[in-house]
Structure formats: C-alpha cells, structure tokens
Amino acid sequence: MAPSSGGGNNGDVTATDNIMNTVGDAERSLFQICVTLRLRLSGVPGFEETVIEEEQDAEEELDPVSLLWRTFRKGFPLILLFNTLKPDDPIELPNSGVRQDKKGKASAFKFVKACIDKLGFDADNCFIMLDLYGDDTTGFVKVVRVVSSVLDLLIKANLIEDMRTSAPDVAYADKSLKRTQQQHIINELVTTERTYVQHLELLQRFKDLVVQKNVIPGDAVHDIFHNLDQILNFQRRFLIRVEQINKQDDTEQNWGKLFVNWMTNFQVYEPYIANQKRCQRTVDAEFNKLKGAGGSNEMRQMVENNASLYGFLMKPFQRLSKYPLLLGDLIKKGDMDAEKTADLEAGKAAATQVLSLTNEAVGREERVLAVEELKTRVEDWKGHRVEQFGELMLYGTFTVVKSEAIATGKDAERQVGTAPARA
C-alpha cells in the first residue's frame, strides 16, 4: 500500500470539461486539510496532548499548518502514530546516545523507514527529511499525505475512531446564513484565492510530469515555468494567512494590513511575470510535445490548445491584477469604520504598487530581449562592444532624417535605443 499521490484519468477530454472555470474546493486547501488532520489525529491516544503542548509553547498564535508542522518536527509524535498500529516490533525512540537536537530527525527517519519497510509505502511517495525540516510547503504536503495514509490504516483496522464523523458541518451551517456585502466580497477573496492556489498546484504537477518524462529540454522547462515553485510556496502561505483571518470575527478582520505586511513577499512574482514573452514563445515552439505529455484529465484539459495552457501560465498576473479590485470593493461596499477603511486604502495602495513593480520588471525584460535581438541583426558593430553600452533604457521605431535624405527628399525609418552614458 502507498500514500495516494493523485491518480490520472485516461478518459477523453469532453466538451463539457472546463478546468479554467472550476471553483477551488475548500477541503483541498492546506489550511483546511490541516484542520481536518488535527481532528483525525485527536483519535490517536496521546497525540492531542502533544499538539496542545506545542500550541502553548509557541510565542505567538499558530495557524493549523504551522502547528502540525512544528509538532511533526519533534519526531516522537510520528513514532507514537506508527506504534498505534500495534506492530509486532514497534519503533523505539532514539537512545540516549543521540544528541537532543538530533532526536527529532532520528525519530522522523525511523518513521519513514518503517512506513516503507513495514507498511509497503512507495518510497517515491514518502517524504524525505528536507520535506519536514525545510521551509517549502510542497514538501510539507508530502508529510501530510503520509500521515493521512497511516491514519487511514488505523481507521480501517478499527484501532481508532474516525473523528470526522462526529464533527459538526460548519460549512453547511454557514450557507444558511444571509451574508452582508462585506461578507460576500470577503467570500469571493477567499474562494478565488483557494481556486488560484489549486490551479498553481495543477501547473506544478504538470511541470513535474514534463520533467519526469523528459518531454522537453530543461532550458525549455525553465523558460515556460520559471520560478513557479517559489510562487506556489509563497501563495500557499498567503492563503493560510487569508484563511486564518477569515476565521476571525468580522470586527477583528483587517484585510488592508494583510496586504501591507505581505507586500515585499510579492516580489517573487517579478521574474515570473517578466518572463511572459519568453514563456509564450517557448509554449508555441514546444506545444505539440506538451500536449502529448499525458497525465490526469485536468492536465489534458489544460493543454487542449495553446491558449488554454498559456491562460493557466498567466494566472499569476491575473491574480495580482485582481487584488486591488477586491480591496476597492471592500472600501466602497464593506461598510468599514474609518480606521479599517484607512487600512484598506493602504492595502490597496500596496497591492497596486506590487502590480506596478511587476510591470516595470516586464519592461526591463523586454529591453533585454530587444538587445538580444539586436545582436543577431547587426552584422558589423564597427569595433564597438555591446556589453559596454550599459542597460538599454528606451527603444522604439522612429523616423531619422539624415543630410543625404534631405537632398533626396526621402526619410529613413530606424530603430533607435538609448543607454546610460559610460564614463
């Protein structure tokens, strides 16, 4: 048996499929997954006490993801989880000879090894120590998947109770309440954020498939997907914070400060969006290979045509463009007090500034591409070295009038660029 890694669907893509317009499932967000996972783990004798202890030791309030991440890093809770299966040879805690600061990793390693050797989990679907002790949410998703699979075995063997069956259906209860305009806008923010992250996750899975199958060269993979993994890692963390705020009472929520506080983190978008022309050019060149990569039904919908794939790849820019609009709606229709409105104004300004900085990055990349093209078009540089010209500041097509042109009455069209003066 192995942890589920998301199976593919070999059926044909039908006309009714429209992955572009799917709405994100709340239960698939890492925040909600960890809320449910903590509930499930509470059925393991002694586990909830460990989580509560970690919660109390924290210097600040922890979101559900950070809380479980820190708990699992202790190592011994994972051993506790495994030994609840009542194996013939339970995992023993590291002996006293292991340094205190190494016991967590030693315990976690024993847990993974036992999952592979004794439970038959596929090693490729298990996590490595970097996934647990690193800082990438994609790695922690693997940890969550393995822990969930062990819980599935415990429930199947009737060794613990499935705590989900006794939980109240809060989501259903919320649907029966009449929402204010403020709540409608916030719901749109949260729902579309979940959808966006799930679309990024789909893109990442497709990228991983392309790399695994060696569908296109590595340089082409980079030209298309660029720093997608970094964006997804950031955006998962941002969504965790969005969902944490959404849990608060309406009077406590401060969406403006969220964007002010996270503004600098959005810089991760600049290289990705600046790469859009190179991305589109590479997609056009490699599309037939990408279309034949296979994968899940969702992936094949995504590469049904060039426009569909490129539309997915441009979702980061579309999302950045959406934030100022949502904050603007909250300012106009949210019926906030003066202090919250001022914070929203500051948040909107921050979100707009992020968009401006990414547009500047696009301009810089366009000028770099213009210089690369110029190098291929000019045959004789008359002894000049392009590398010494400095950064191209401005370029365009202009009418240039030269003395010989005046004599003949003909104007010549030239492409002209300017660079900063060199001493």
Please state what every model-predicted region is:
Residues 389-423:
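Structured beta-rich ligand-binding regulatory domains in large eukaryotic signaling proteins
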